[in-house]
Structures are given as C-alpha cells and as structure tokens.
Regions:
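Short, Lys/Arg-rich flexible segments
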Residues: 1-73, 99-144
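Mid-chain, well-packed structural core segment of small domains
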Residues: 68-100
C-alpha cells in the first residue's frame, strides 16, 4: 500500500482497489456461479424441441459487469437466438425471457430465475466476499 498523507488519499486508494477487485476477482466469482446456475436452472430444466440450444448464457463473454461507486452490477447480455423458423427470441431480451418465462412465441417452459439462484448461491457460499478479500490482499491491504 502506498504512503498517503491524508484520510482522503487513503479513501481514494481503497476505493480504487475495491473497484479493481470488483471488476476482476468478484466478477469472476459471480460469472462462475452464474454459469453453474444457468446450467442447473435453465439448461437442465427441459430439452427444447423447437430450436437447437446454443449454450451461450453461461459464457463469460455474455456475463458482463460494470462498477459504479463501489457497486458491481452484473448483466447477462446473451444475444437472442436468430436460428429456427421462426427465430424463437429475435428482438427480445433473452435473459428477461428466460428469467420470467414471458415472451416466448411458442410453448413456454416457464420462469427459470437463474439470477436469483445465483444471488442465493453466492449468499450461501460467500464466494463473492472471499473474492473481494483476495483482491484487497493482492493489493497489499490487510483484511480479516
């Protein structure tokens, strides 16, 4: 940790370290858990008959995070499936359709709330907290 001359400098440094850890270690922990929950809650719940599944919702590139004011906001931005006749989810928010079960143009398998399942699993495991602590330690900040 660098030498600081004021409380404001210390707070600025700590906020920057927290934000860096949120963007890296914590986001990685959330991505890993969301991928598990997508597999369990979404993919394992039923086998589609109208379209061929792409298995993209658990892909790291589709689980993005943005840090604002030491808060990490995570969003699944998997694009709609444009395959099939008619395309099953084109021009729709795929994550919202899957989460709510509303917006299908054919048989709906119902709501598959993978985001809540992710939050519940993280709450139970504390993996996101451990990830933040690891990021702080990596930056030279002692944590308990």
């Amino acid at each position: 940790m660098p030498t600081v001359k004021s409380l404001n400098q210390a707070m600025t440094y700590i906020r920057n370290v927290i934000n860096t850890s949120l963007r890296t270690e914590v986001l990685d922990a959330v991505r890993k858990e969301e991928a598990k929950q997508v597999q369990s809650v979404v993919y394992d719940s039923y086998q589609p008959t109208v379209y061929e599944r792409r298995y993209d919702m658990g892909n790291d590139a589709n689980i993005v995070g943005m840090v604002n004011g030491t808060v990490l906001q995570v969003e699944n931005i998997t694009p709609p499936n444009s395959e099939g006749n008619p395309p099953p989810t084109t021009d729709k928010d795929l994550a919202k359709v899957v989460e709510t079960g509303v917006g299908y143009d054919y048989f709906s398998p119902g709501a598959r709330p993978f985001t809540q399942a992710t939050m519940d699993a993280l709450s139970a495991s504390g993996a996101h907290v451990d990830a933040l602590k690891n990021g702080l330690v990596k930056a030279g900040i002692r944590v308990k």
